[in-house]
């Protein structure tokens, strides 16, 4: 038969001491039930909401290399650099092919001529051989469009005479040709009504 000392409960030796409480879930820092000092290492919890756009993880290079496949010869921990030219077997054996240097196009520069430099604008239009505003080689700028519109107004004002702008009655058809009023039916005199009411009345917003 076993002695009583062999079956003593562990709590009998800790009668005068305060009970250790579990402050965290099992597996946490203070769940040591045997009283030995465990090394206090902080738990590595990954924040799922954190963005890693600007700084890569420690394991990102290793995961990236594994994901890219075995045909890419990277050492583990060697991340491929952004903007690095791909190295193929031809360039490794024979070197880079000599390419002619072409100047880069300035995409932010406008091709619309502005300002007082009309000679350069006309030269540009002559090179393009296009028609702008119905005239070949004309400068498409704010000042020229304003002057051409006022010129057109002067021409149109000179050709106008008294008449109805909606129906066209009373305008000159040609040089001195007037629209002749037709004789009234049944041989009576034609009555010219000068007080005409426009279609829809005066309150229609057109007059």
From Swiss-Prot:
Q: Does the keyword field hold Phosphoprotein?
A: yes
Composition-biased stretches (Low complexity): 136-149
Q: Name one Pfam family in it.
A: JUPITER
Residue positions, PTM Phosphoserine:
30, 111, 138, 149
User: Residue ranges of region Disordered?
Assistant: 129-174, 188-207
Polar residues: compositionally biased ranges: 150-164
Q: Which residues carry this modification: Phosphothreonine?
A: 41, 102
Record family assignment: Belongs to the MAP Jupiter family.
Q: What function is annotated for this protein? A: Binds to all microtubule populations.
Protein name as catalogued: Microtubule-associated protein Jupiter
What is the taxonomic lineage of the source species? Eukaryota, Metazoa, Ecdysozoa, Arthropoda, Hexapoda
The gene from which this protein is expressed is Jupiter
């Amino acid at each position: 038969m076993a002695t009583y000392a062999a079956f003593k409960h562990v709590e009998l030796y800790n009668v005068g001491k305060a009970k250790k409480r579990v402050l965290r879930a099992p597996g946490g820092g203070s769940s040591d039930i045997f009283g030995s000092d465990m090394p206090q290492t902080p738990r590595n919890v990954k924040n799922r909401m954190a963005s890693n756009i600007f700084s890569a993880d420690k394991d990102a290079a290793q995961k990236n290399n594994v994901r890219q496949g075995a045909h890419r010869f990277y050492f583990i921990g060697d991340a491929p650099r952004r903007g690095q030219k791909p190295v193929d077997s031809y360039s490794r054996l024979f070197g880079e092919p000599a390419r002619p240097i072409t100047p880069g196009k300035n995409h932010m520069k406008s091709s619309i001529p502005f300002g007082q430099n009309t000679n350069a604008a006309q030269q540009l239009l002559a090179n393009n051989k296009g028609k702008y505003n119905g005239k070949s080689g004309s400068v498409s700028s704010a000042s020229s469009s304003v002057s051409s519109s006022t010129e057109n107004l002067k021409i149109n004002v000179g050709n106008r005479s008294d008449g109805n702008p909606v129906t066209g009655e009373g305008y000159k058809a040609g040089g001195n040709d007037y629209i002749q009023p037709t004789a009234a039916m049944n041989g009576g005199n034609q009555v010219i009504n000068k007080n005409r009411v426009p279609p829809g009345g005066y309150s229609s917003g057109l007059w």
